Amino acid sequence: DNFEQYETYSRKIEKILQNSKPKKDDEPIFMIRDITERQFKRQAEPSVIPCPFRQLNDITNAGGYPEHSVNVILDKPKAKKTFFMVNLARGYLRMKKSVLYVDTENGKEQIMDRFIQSSINKTKKELYSGEYDKLEAKHLRKLARFGVELVVERVPAMITDCNYIRELIIKLRNQGINIKVLMVDYAGKLASIARDKEDFDRISNVYIDIQNLAEEMDLDIVWTAHHITREGKKHRTTRYDENDISGSIAIVRNAHTIVGLNSTEQEEKDDILRCELVVQRDGLPSGRALFKCDVERQRCVEFTKEQRKQYDEIYGEKLEESLKKKGNPDANEDKYNKKQGDI
């Protein structure tokens, strides 16, 4: 009973706080009149936020993604999307940002196990042996000193919408956990707030709902994953393009950045994961990030500059050739040669 009273009370407080904030965002901004404030804000509260992976930041215009961005990871079903998202989330914790991981597919215990494995670099068997409990506790104490938390929530697919996630973020913030990064695994399985029946409309609206949620809750970023079409599987060894996105092309309109997880047979053998840029609003039209993968330990480590240089020498030329052959956007000479600016 007390808990229900607390819920009602915390909602009232939240409402009062929301209403008392000056409605700054509703007002237009002035190019000339606002110069001083704008320059100060750029330094004090940068609106571009780097992600944990250097190579992805390097292919953007400003070394990161604008706040409230919605980014999408593409791959075929049952591939490495969740694996990649777990490692991304781990990176954000190291950047002192609390993460909410909303899962529609795997189950929260499995996701949490993957996080712990990835963090302490152990296999599932080693984790369950109990021999590494001390190591886990030591690692988590270090994260606790950063004042961050990772929250994993399993939600029913096709029923849960962004209003539920919003309530959850508010509830966590009331408990002192300031969620700044949202991972949704995956958004295509959520219901839209408008309760659309048709998949195409539902998915389009879910992405709009997520964008609105990111802005309203002042999230740094939202990452989600999405499946590719059957046709898209042909591009797994090269690079996906925007027509490979299953379910709704509107995702391209509403996402800030879309990357695909690719690898050739040789790269698979060498445990290399290649993250290829499909489309982004503010940065280079093409580019990639490379990672060394250990799926057994759920760990994905970014290439060093030296490893990247070696990779480009060994694989680079061959890869560029096959990219041009596959009717990829890079076969369009003009687009390929355009190496900067908005696209």
Regions found by a protein language model. Name each.
Residues 1-34:
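Short, small/acidic-rich helices and loops at N termini and domain boundaries
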Residues 23-122, 142, 150, 342:
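The Walker A/P-loop phosphate-binding site
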Residues 60-61, 91-178, 192, 288-290:
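Cytosolic-facing regulatory segments adjacent to core modules
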Residues 105-106, 224-229, 264:
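A short beta-strand-to-loop transition that corresponds to the Sensor-1 phosphate-sensing loop
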Residues 127-130, 154-159, 191-204, 234-241:
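Flexible beta-alpha connector loops of hexameric P-loop NTPases
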Residues 162-182, 215-217, 231-343:
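C-terminal regions of RecA-like/P-loop NTPase motor modules
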Residues 180-212:
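Helical hairpin unit composed of two closely spaced alpha helices linked by a short loop
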Residues 183, 220-227:
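Structural recognition of the conserved hydrophobic beta-strand(s) that form the central parallel beta-sheet
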